[in-house]
Design a protein with these regions (language model features):
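Membrane-interface "cap" regions at the ends of multi-pass membrane proteins
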Residues: 1-38, 42-47, 59-60, 64, ...
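Helix-loop-helix junctions that connect adjacent transmembrane segments
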Residues: 5-8, 48-49, 125-132, 160-291
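C-terminal membrane-solvent junction of multi-pass transporters and transport-like membrane proteins
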Residues: 10, 325-332, 375-426
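Extracellular loop-to-transmembrane helix junctions
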Residues: 32-130, 241-251, 429-441
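A generic transmembrane alpha-helix motif of multi-pass inner-membrane proteins
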Residues: 36, 368-370, 374, 401-490
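Membrane-helix boundary/coupling elements in multi-pass transport proteins
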Residues: 75, 98-113, 219-227, 283-323, ...
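TM-loop-TM module centered on a large, flexible mid-protein loop between adjacent transmembrane helices
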Residues: 81-83, 88, 120-125, 239-305, ...
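Membrane-interface loop-to-helix entry segments
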Residues: 132-183, 238-242, 373-376, 402-409, ...
Length: 490
């Protein structure tokens, strides 16, 4: 394959609408509702809507942090770069590594239900076959791997189709759920309060699961080097994406509480959305929502691949991981080595996952483990924003609230649920979550000893209004300067 270590990613491919779609797709509304509602109900019972509401507030603080940091440092590594340039390079690497590990785990956890749901469309009995689900899920994964390899333009076109159909289906079923008459329970405002949580630890467990619901909107920051007017667009798209998925999550979680009994939720597990569809539209509803979940799952596999490969690309470019990961294909302008490595590792994990139990068991532990890793890198990014903007926080009340208090609250919340949840999670989830982070210490210390320039960073300070884009080694600065202002929509 053609490649060049001096080439960068293709600039000016994505417009504003494209990045909003990517943010929504990254959070995978249909998949998150289907795969996680039973886990959330198991953690907090009827308080699922409250957990999503109270996690949305600090999550918006983290989205604000990403928005403000992306204005002063355009980098495909996102929090990996920002945290390294504000707090400490070691923390920056751990932040990037947390994303890489969580995304890799998700690619397995997400591909399994993609295979299961595909089989369910033809024969529901086959959906519980873990081995067959793994094979079909791996096939979907390879298709998305090829799409991501083909470039950002192909990626966003595929995403517009998949997410467009998914959101249209969800909108129709949201209306059907609102007007459904034969309900298991009447709506209760207490579901949005604290009374249904089992103490502080119960709230923390629910919030950790809720963090998994929202995770993925930050793919816009990993695409910043390929986005038009990225200093404004990526952060705005992330904020809009969080708002859209919050509304969808609340509507469907409340609908599940109202329409389905606790026994139905427990019985259906990762197929809870199909059960809801069957209740509101008997005969066809379940099948149609399975299609929505399948599209959502495949779509978020694509955005997750983007996040992990762009993060590894930035690490390879900085030589904090093998420099080959920073190679870009001459024709497609994608980090083809990083994509190939991720594909190979994921396929090995697909095979290993067959020894871990059923699809439902794998999902439950994976979601909790990913939640721990999400809390780490989101929390560090929130702190990084406060440090980067510390000299400007007292300029106005808006600067203090949006640049300091809210991101700081978001960071504190993420670290709190991380600590509180450790004692509540299953041992397998803790081992996967913490063990995955610990493995990152090996490459971090190795490349630090090798003298990577990443560990001697230029400090990120918003008061100096850093305007220069990231310029890879060997790439002219004038080329990077053209990152903004060109027509990119198609």
């Amino acid at each position: 394959m053609s490649n060049s270590t001096g080439r960068g990613l293709q600039a000016n491919v994505l417009g504003t609408f494209d990045t909003v779609v990517m943010a929504v797709a990254g959070s995978a509304p249909a998949y998150s509702i289907a795969a996680t509602t039973a886990v959330l109900a198991g953690a907090v019972g009827l308080a699922g809507p409250a957990a999503l509401l109270y996690c949305a507030i600090p999550m918006l603080g983290i989205a604000l942090a990403f928005s403000r940091l992306s204005r002063i440092d355009v980098n495909a590594g996102a929090s990996y770069s920002w945290v390294g340039r504000t707090l400490h390079p070691f923390l920056g690497f751990i932040s990037g590594w947390a994303l890489v590990i969580s995304a890799t785990i998700f690619m397995v956890a997400g591909s399994l239900p993609a295979g299961s749901m595909t089989l369910a469309l033809f024969d529901e009995g086959l959906a519980d076959n873990t081995a067959l689900s793994t094979v079909v899920g791996a096939a979907w994964f390879l298709v998305m791997l090829a799409v991501v390899l083909g470039g950002a333009r192909l990626t966003v076109r595929a995403q517009l189709i998949m997410s467009g159909v998914e959101l249209a289906i969800l909108a129709v079923f949201a209306v059907l759920a609102v007007f459904h008459a034969d309900n298991s329970l009447p709506f209760d405002w207490s579901w949005l309060g604290f009374s249904h949580f089992d103490g502080v630890s119960g709230f923390a467990s629910g919030a950790l699961v809720a963090a998994f619901y929202y995770w993925g909107w930050d793919v816009t920051s990993n695409l910043s080097e390929e986005t038009r007017d990225s200093r404004r667009t990526t952060g705005l798209a992330g904020l809009i994406g969080v708002g859209i998925v919050f509304l969808l999550f609340e509507v469907f979680t409340i609908a599940v509480n109202v329409i389905l009994s606790s026994q139905q939720i427990e019985k259906n597990g990762a197929n809870v959305l199909a059960a809801l569809g069957e209740e509101v539209w008997p005969g066809w509803g379940g099948k149609v929502l399975v299609v929505a979940v399948l599209l959502s799952t495949v779509a978020t596999l694509e955005t997750t691949l983007i996040q992990v490969t762009r993060s590894l690309f930035a690490m390879g470019r900085d030589r904090t991981m093998p420099s080959a990961l920073g190679r870009v294909h001459r024709t497609w302008n994608t980090p083809w080595v990083a994509i190939a490595v991720v594909g190979g590792v994921a396929l090995v994990l697909f095979v290993a996952s067959n020894a871990l139990g059923s699809v439902g068991d794998i999902l439950a532990d994976a979601i909790s483990a990913i939640g721990l890793q999400i809390a780490v890198y989101y929390g560090l990014a929130g702190l990084a924003a406060v440090v980067a903007y510390r000299k400007t926080l007292l300029k106005s009340p808006a600067d203090f609230l949006l640049g300091g208090l809210w991101p700081l609250f978001g960071a504190a919340f993420m670290f709190w649920i991380f600590v509180e949840s450790l004692g509540e999670l299953a041992p397998a989830a803790v081992v996967i979550g913490i063990g995955g982070l610990a493995v990152g210490l090996v490459p971090m210390l190795w490349y630090w000893r090798q003298g990577s320039d990443y560990y001697r960073p230029a400090r990120l300070d918003a008061s100096r209004t850093v305007e220069a884009d990231y310029v890879p080694v060997g790439r002219p600065a004038t080329h990077a300067a053209g990152h903004e202002g060109l027509s990119t929509d198609f």
